[in-house]
């Protein structure tokens, strides 16, 4: 056929022309030119209209725009010239030539207009133009080649060549980013947003990140900012709106709503996933075509077809690389959005919970563990349906090769799928049990870490350590059932891919043999089928794991939905506004004064609120109301009628457990109103909880919080709350960090910082729930006078102040008093004088009304006569040192790994279990890989004599499959069931031991959330993610080595490239890991403050809602979540870059092998070529898996690194000399000698200075002093919680510096200021943590502290302690009851009666006299009357020095001029008598 006739036919192949390796001209013009041009002409108007209507000008005019215009004009000129050439050509024009040329001219004009609009109105390169120009260049190049080969119309060929070159230049120009030309407001957009389609395909937008990460330490601020659709506020609004409209009737409503709100990003994943499937199943056809071509006679003149095969392999593998990267990256984008939505919703819901329903641990588990499972499940969700499609296609193609034998893998697949679906339900149930066990352990651990001073003082370290370790062992035991199910699931997943080829080849061979030998298993059929089995294996295994992972995420969705459907707190109050604005700043404080910078969060709070005056002149009015925490139970308080007058001081008093705190929470709307009503003049008030609530931050941040910053007002508040002198002792003053829950602060300081926050907020109403209990009398007088005296700042502001107090000495100064009687029914109210006239709690208080009490302020001098001892400054200094150390350590180690970490991991497991695992994996991989060689031998034997020794070849093949399953189960069992409990127990024990042995300065300097992360997130990684990563990484590593060997066997010259391949892989991995490790560290670090804020919010719900800070905290949460999303998203994004690069490397290997096949035709056996090509397909998959598993392992091994650093870097409080074991009866008497004792935190300044004191057996000793004088330090020294720098302490003849510290703490009895009870545990366990006491003994102790009736009313000793709903004072009484049960002759009370009223204080003193009559008692006292009446000796401390010592009556007799104790007593007595 001549060329002219050939090109006028449709073709598509030009048979007989140009070597048969070309398309016809008609086909090229009608299929390659016209359609793509028509698509441009259709798309361009819509795109241009959209940009002009929806977008503003984004790019400044520049030379680059003019370059694009010039290129467009050149293209138009070349297209016109091309049309002219066609019209002048007498030959070889087709019926499509002129229409195609004319359309191209129109397209050139369209390109000119669209290029201008895209350049000016879009901040990214045009996707429409880039795609059109890309395909147009490829298709035009094909047509240009045809024209050159024709040779009939050289001018047309030249103009076509010029047009193609111009399009290449246009494509280059349109591809370049416009960031340098963007207007200033758009230049900070994320790199991904401003990148073009090719940058997205090949992830080149990440290269700046790799450059910085390779050579520098990355910071979150240096990462790409989030684009709009990832912003948590946007995502929350999106989900919240849809969730509000959802019916919420089914278990999966939340899942459906999330899908509805993110429908577009989720559905966009489908197209690249389908393209990936298409490219994947091109591979068997390429193998078949390559083997057929290789088996032909080497003299055949068809080398062009060989070149075509090279091009086909290249295009298919490039297509696989791009589509893999795109569908995985789009999946990560959708997953990131889901994460942002759910975490935002969880926080929003948590901030709406009632205070009784708020469980920090349960909520945090949802935010951490469940969100992680959803993340994992959603990243594989699209694989579930895609794997089914892949299975169907693979089976169909197998049917074309093996006939009915293809039904074997179908049956195997159905068996695997059905078995997996059945197993998934059991997996979910076991997983839920495991998560609950984790939650229980973390709850107890978190509580212990938050109260370490109480734990150590009570001698509970060993008891709690044993209990928590037992919970850990129980947790691992429960998880064992889950792990065994995972192995069963894995066996189901691998049975089909391993045995399907065996059974299929056997069935095919037997059928072919029975049919007379038709369809012999030759090389082509064997290896084409084997490639299909390889492609079938991946979706079969992936389907099972993806389905399991997705169903696990569905279970987490159900758990989160249940949480979101939890009843929110209901504010039953009636809020009445009068339209006035709240009072302004105090007089003399000008808004023009110098202020500290205002954060965006603080700006959101700079608004006025309605006044505190209701229409009837009262701040609150309670009318016949009943309050309770559970509407289905008896009210805690009932029939309450009371008023809170506006602008007055109201005191709420009553016995311990009478419901004072409940009444305050009712005023805040935190407790349900079962009947009656509460009228409030304002929805927000300043509130100080009985247990001070603090967020982790500086003193300044804690006080100012979200109020308007004003420096003069701030300084005035510090002075009023007697904090200035405390701040001078902190290393950074008010910029010192106070730690989690204010751990760095002493009890009194914590209460005063909380009080300062309430005063600073300048709310019209302040509620103070027993905030003076932790202050010494002198400091209390000063603070009370400064705030509530006749000229106190709260009086000047006309603030409504409600004070709950267990001390009645302030009653005469109250304008109004509400008195609860302890029965829970009714109350009395009125002025002090009025209440004194009737029979009630006030009249029984024996407090008289001095003249002018309410008009005259209690007199007091400064809060302290000398600077307080810096008891917490050492902790703050330790914190500073730790921050610097961690910073240096992180900077040095983030970008690189450490082989020592892997050694540390293996040591925790044991070398023998590790070697068993390694040998089992190697055996498994051998049995997996060798069958390829075996099949080559079988095919070669079949070629010589069909069906020869069929049983022999099938039997060995089946045996190898069975052995691979056996070794797979053995290796997986060894890792998941045997090695995980070993490492899990060892690491937890190391962490727990480190924490229990850590000094108190560690807990002051280290955020509790960071330590909890070691016990939760890191151990979770070690329990599941790390072992699976290690298993997958090592197995895939050995498999890749085996496949490289097989590729080299099949195409031995390829082995020459392997060293270069390995070097390239090392460079890529090295470059990648230096960035990915940092991103992983940043991901974990960014989660810690997010989790910390979540926990702080849940524990401080009453406070933050009272202040009206919910919105401000939610804004802060959005900022932290957005900060967390950046490394989270980019970590997965850089993994996609790595996947793409690896795919490119595999593409090079595949092309190299095919090039060798074509160039060495006839020299390579077809069977070995098949071995090489099949293994290339598998190597492509496994190399990506290896690098993914390896990088995942490298990030997961960070958990081991952090634990290793934590255990090695955390100092132990124990000293080498502390080895002496005291006699079992020690101490037997109770004598204590302080001999010139100086003590402090490690190398810090002494907080006790040269203390000498002798306490005889049975003496009752009271320790007095101003706040910060060293009282708690003296107790801490006795319990060895601070270190001796000089001197010694002798207890019953033994120097305690030689005795193990925990031994001392278990031999002495300590009652801490903050009562420590183990929530979630029974009353019996809390009363008798060590066990061994009878129920009668426990009952006797609880009766003594008047708590037995509460215990019996709630179910007895086996009732959980939190079900008793003990008040703060009752919790202290419980601890005293626990002290009664311990027989030690030494009892130490650290302000144990700070939160009880006078009656209970008298009860405690009576118990000291009666139950501790033969014991030595050391008590820190603030109530000096108690020291006068109940103690044999008083020790007065000042600035860490022993000021004086003696019998209280003797010291008092010396008079205030000669005695510090007498001076302190007189300063209190001159105002008001103490309680009796």
Curated annotation (Swiss-Prot):
GO terms for molecular function: ABC-type transporter activity; ATP binding; ATP hydrolysis activity. InterPro entries: AAA+_ATPase, ABC1_TM_dom, ABC1_TM_sf, ABC_transporter-like_ATP-bd, ABC_transporter-like_CS, ABC_transporter_C-like, ABCC_6TM_D1, ABCC_6TM_D2. The keyword Cytoplasm does not apply. Residues 622-847, 1232-1464 form the ABC transporter domain. CDD domains: ABC_6TM_ABCC_D1, ABC_6TM_ABCC_D2, ABCC_MRP_domain1, ABCC_MRP_domain2. It is a multi-pass membrane protein. Pfam families: ABC_membrane, ABC_tran, TMD0_ABC. SMART domains: AAA. It comes from the Eukaryota. One of its GO terms (cellular component) is plasma membrane. It is found in: Cell membrane. Glycans are attached at residues 2, 624, 682, 696, 798, 836, 1250, 1414. Keywords: ATP-binding, Cell membrane, Glycoprotein, Membrane, Nucleotide-binding, Transmembrane, Transmembrane helix, Transport. Its main location: membrane. Residues 855-870 have a biased composition (Low complexity). ATP binds at residues 654-661, 1265-1272. The chain crosses the membrane at residues 23-43, 64-84, 97-117, 156-176, 266-286, 305-325, 384-404, 407-427, 485-505, 532-552, 906-926, 950-970, 1021-1041, 1045-1065, 1137-1157, 1167-1187. Residues 586-615, 842-870 are annotated as: Disordered. Residues 274-552, 916-1195 form the ABC transmembrane type-1 domain. ABC-type transporter; part of the gene cluster that mediates the biosynthesis of the fusahexin, a cyclic hydrophobic hexapeptide with the amino acid sequence cyclo-(D-Ala-L-Leu-D-allo-Thr-L-Pro-D-Leu-L-Leu) that plays an important role in cell surface hydrophobicity. Belongs to the ABC transporter superfamily. ABCC family. Conjugate transporter (TC 3.A.1.208) subfamily. This is ABC-type transporter FG02316. It comes from Gibberella zeae (strain ATCC MYA-4620 / CBS 123657 / FGSC 9075 / NRRL 31084 / PH-1) (Wheat head blight fungus).
């Amino acid at each position: 056929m001549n060329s002219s006739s050939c090109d006028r036919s449709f073709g598509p192949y030009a048979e007989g022309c140009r070597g048969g390796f070309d398309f016809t001209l008609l086909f090229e013009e009608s299929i390659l030119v016209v359609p793509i041009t028509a698509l441009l002409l259709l798309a361009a108007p819509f795109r241009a209209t959209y940009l002009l209507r929806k977008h503003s000008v984004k790019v400044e005019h520049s030379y680059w725009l003019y370059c694009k215009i010039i290129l467009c004009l050149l293209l138009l000129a070349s297209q016109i010239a091309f049309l002219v050439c066609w019209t002048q050509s007498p030959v070889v024009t087709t019926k499509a030539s002129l229409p195609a040329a004319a359309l191209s001219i129109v397209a050139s004009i369209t390109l000119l207009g669209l290029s201008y609009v895209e350049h000016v109105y879009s901040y990214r390169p045009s996707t429409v133009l880039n795609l059109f120009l890309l395909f147009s260049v490829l298709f035009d190049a094909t047509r240009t080649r045809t024209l050159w080969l024709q040779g009939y119309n050289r001018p047309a060929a030249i103009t076509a060549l010029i047009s193609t070159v111009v399009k290449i230049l246009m494509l280059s120009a349109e591809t370049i980013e416009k960031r340098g030309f963007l207007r200033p407001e758009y230049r900070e957009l994320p790199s991904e947003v401003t990148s073009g389609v090719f940058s997205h395909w090949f992830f080149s937008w990440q290269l700046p990140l790799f450059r910085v990460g390779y050579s520098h330490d990355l910071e979150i601020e240096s990462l790409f900012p989030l684009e709009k659709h990832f912003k948590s506020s946007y995502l929350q609004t999106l989900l919240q709106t849809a969730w509000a409209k959802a019916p919420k009737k089914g278990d999966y409503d939340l899942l459906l709503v999330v899908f509805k709100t993110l429908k577009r990003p989720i559905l966009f994943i489908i197209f690249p996933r389908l393209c990936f499937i298409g490219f994947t199943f091109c591979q068997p056809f390429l193998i078949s075509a390559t083997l057929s071509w290789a088996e032909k006679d080497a003299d055949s003149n068809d080398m062009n077809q060989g070149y075509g095969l090279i091009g086909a392999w290249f295009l298919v593998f490039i297509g696989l690389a791009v589509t893999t990267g795109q569908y995985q990256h789009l999946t990560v984008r959708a997953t990131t959005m889901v994460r942002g939505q759910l975490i935002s919703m969880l926080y929003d819901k948590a901030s709406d919970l009632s205070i009784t329903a708020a469980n920090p641990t349960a909520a945090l588990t949802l935010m951490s563990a469940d969100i992680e499972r959803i993340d994992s499940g959603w990243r594989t969700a699209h694989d579930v349906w895609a794997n089914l499609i892949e299975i169907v296609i693979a089976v169909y193609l197998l049917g074309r090769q093996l006939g009915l034998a293809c039904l074997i893998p179908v049956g195997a697949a159905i068996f695997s799928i059905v078995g997996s679906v059945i197993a998934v339900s059991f997996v979910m149930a076991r997983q839920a049990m495991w998560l609950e066990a984790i939650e229980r352990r973390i709850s107890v651990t978190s509580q212990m870490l938050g109260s370490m001073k109480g734990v150590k003082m009570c001698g509970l370290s060993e008891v709690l350590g044993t209990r928590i370790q037992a919970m850990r062992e129980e947790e691992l035991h429960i998880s064992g059932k889950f792990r065994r199910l995972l192995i069963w699931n894995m066996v189901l997943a691998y049975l089909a891919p391993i045995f399907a080829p065996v059974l299929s080849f056997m069935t095919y061979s037997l059928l072919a043999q029975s049919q007379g030998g038709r369809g012999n298993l030759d090389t082509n059929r064997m290896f084409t089928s084997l490639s299909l089995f390889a492609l079938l294996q991946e979706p079969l295994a992936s389907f099972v794991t993806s389905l399991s992972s997705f169903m696990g995420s569905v279970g987490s969705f159900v758990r989160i939905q249940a949480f979101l459907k939890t009843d929110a707190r209901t504010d039953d109050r009636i809020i009445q506004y009068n339209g006035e604005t709240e009072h302004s700043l105090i007089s003399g404080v000008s808004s023009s004064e110098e202020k500290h910078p205002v954060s965006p969060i603080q700006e959101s709070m700079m608004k006025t609120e309605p006044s505190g005056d209701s229409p009837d002149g009262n701040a609150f009015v309670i009318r016949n109301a009943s309050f309770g925490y559970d509407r289905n139970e008896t009210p805690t308080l009932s029939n309450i009628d009371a008023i809170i007058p506006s602008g007055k001081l109201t005191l709420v008093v009553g016995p311990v457990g009478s419901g004072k705190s409940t009444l305050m929470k009712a005023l805040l709307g935190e407790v349900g109103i079962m009947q009656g009503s509460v009228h409030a003049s304002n929805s927000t008030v300043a509130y100080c909880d009985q247990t001070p609530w603090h967020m982790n931050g500086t003193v300044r941040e804690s006080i100012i919080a979200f109020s308007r910053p004003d420096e003069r007002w701030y300084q005035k508040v510090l002075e009023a709350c007697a904090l200035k002198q405390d701040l001078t002792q902190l290393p950074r003053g008010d910029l010192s960090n106070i730690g989690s829950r204010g751990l760095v602060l002493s009890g009194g300081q914590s209460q005063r910082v909380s009080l300062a926050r309430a005063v600073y907020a300048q709310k019209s109403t302040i509620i103070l729930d027993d905030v003076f209990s932790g202050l010494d009398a002198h400091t209390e007088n000063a603070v009370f006078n400064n705030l509530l005296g006749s000229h106190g700042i709260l009086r000047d502001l006309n603030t409504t102040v409600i004070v709950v107090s267990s001390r009645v000495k302030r009653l005469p100064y109250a304008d109004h008093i509400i008195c609860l009687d302890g029965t829970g029914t009714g109350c009395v109210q009125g002025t002090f004088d009025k209440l004194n006239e009737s029979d009630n709690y006030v009249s029984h208080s024996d407090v008289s009304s001095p003249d002018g009490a309410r008009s005259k302020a209690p007199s007091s001098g400064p809060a302290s006569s000398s600077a307080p001892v810096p008891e917490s400054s050492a902790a703050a200094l330790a914190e500073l040192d730790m921050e610097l150390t961690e910073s240096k350590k992180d900077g040095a180690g983030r970008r690189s790994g450490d082989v020592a970490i892997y050694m540390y991991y293996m040591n925790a497991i044991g070398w023998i279990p590790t070697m068993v695992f390694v040998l089992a994996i190697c055996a498994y991989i051998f049995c997996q890989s060798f069958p390829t060689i075996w099949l080559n031998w079988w095919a070669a034997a079949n070629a010589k004599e069909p069906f020869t020794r069929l049983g022999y070849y099938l039997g060995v093949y089946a045996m190898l499959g069975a052995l691979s399953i056996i070794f797979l189960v053995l290796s997986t069992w060894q890792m998941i069931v045997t090695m995980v409990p070993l490492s899990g127990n060892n690491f937890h024990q190391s962490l727990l031991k480190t924490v229990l042995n850590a000094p108190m300065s560690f807990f002051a300097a280290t955020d509790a959330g960071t330590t909890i992360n070691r016990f939760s997130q890191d151990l979770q990684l070690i329990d599941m993610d790390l072992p699976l990563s290690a298993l997958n990484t090592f197995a895939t590593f050995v498999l890749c080595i085996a496949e490289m060997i097989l590729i080299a066997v099949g195409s031995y010259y390829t082995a020459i490239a392997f060293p270069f391949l390995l070097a390239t892989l090392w460079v890529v991995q090295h470059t990648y890991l230096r960035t990915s490790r940092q991103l992983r560290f940043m991901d974990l670090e960014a989660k810690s403050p997010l989790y910390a804020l979540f926990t702080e919010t849940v524990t401080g719900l009453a406070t933050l809602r009272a202040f009206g800070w919910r919105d401000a905290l939610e804004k802060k949460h959005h900022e932290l979540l957005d900060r967390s999303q950046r490394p989270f998203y980019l970590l997965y994004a850089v993994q996609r870059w790595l996947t793409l690069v690896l795919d490119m490397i595999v593409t090079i290997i595949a092309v190299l092998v095919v090039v060798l096949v074509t160039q060495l035709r006839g020299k390579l056996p077809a069977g070995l070529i098949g071995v090489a090509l099949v293994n290339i397909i598998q190597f492509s998959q496994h190399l990506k898996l290896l690098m993914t598993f390896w990088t995942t392992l490298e990030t997961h091994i960070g958990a081991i690194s952090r634990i290793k650093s934590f255990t090695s870097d955390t100092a132990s409080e124990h000293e080498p000399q502390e080895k002496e074991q005291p006699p079992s009866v020690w101490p037997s008497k109770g004598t204590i000698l302080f001999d010139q004792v100086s003590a402090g935190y490690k190398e810090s300044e002494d907080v006790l200075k040269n203390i000498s004191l002798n306490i005889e057996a049975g003496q009752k000793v009271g320790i007095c002093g101003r706040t910060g004088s060293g009282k708690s330090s003296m107790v801490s020294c006795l319990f060895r919680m601070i270190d001796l720098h000089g001197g010694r302490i002798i207890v019953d003849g033994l120097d305690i510096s030689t005795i193990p510290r925990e031994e001392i703490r278990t031999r002495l009895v300590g009652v801490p200021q903050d009562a420590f009870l183990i929530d979630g545990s029974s009353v019996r366990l809390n009363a008798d943590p060590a066990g061994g006491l009878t129920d009668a003994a426990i009952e006797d102790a609880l009766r003594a502290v008047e708590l037995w009736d509460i215990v019996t009313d709630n179910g007895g000793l086996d009732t959980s302690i939190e079900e008793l709903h003990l008040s703060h004072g009752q919790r202290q009484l419980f601890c005293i009851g626990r002290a009664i049960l311990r027989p030690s002759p030494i009892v130490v009370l650290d302000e144990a009666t700070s939160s009880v009223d006078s009656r209970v204080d008298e009860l405690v003193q009576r118990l000291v006299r009666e139950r501790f009559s033969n014991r030595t008692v050391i008590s820190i006292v603030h109530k000096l009357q108690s020291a006068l009446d109940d103690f044999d000796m008083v020790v007065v401390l000042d600035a860490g020095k022993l000021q004086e010592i003696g019998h209280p009556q003797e010291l008092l007799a010396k008079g205030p001029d000669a005695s510090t104790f007498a001076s302190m007593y007189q300063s209190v007595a001159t105002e008001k008598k103490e309680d009796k």
